[in-house]
């Protein structure tokens, strides 16, 4: 997940080698698992809804390609083609 997620981001947004799961990765890992509601993500990670919204927006703005398609691309990570 981490490598495929990083491939969607510009280099400055990518976690450095050896860095543990940062907040952005945790948020988008939950989104990949199907938890897309910011309120639920905020409760799970113990952040405010505003903080989750800000992280999601910041990452989408720094993504490679169309920002409106970013979360759709995250949902495709690790998906098995049939």
Predicted regions and their residues:
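Cytosolic nucleotide-binding catalytic cores of signal-transduction proteins
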Residues: 1-82
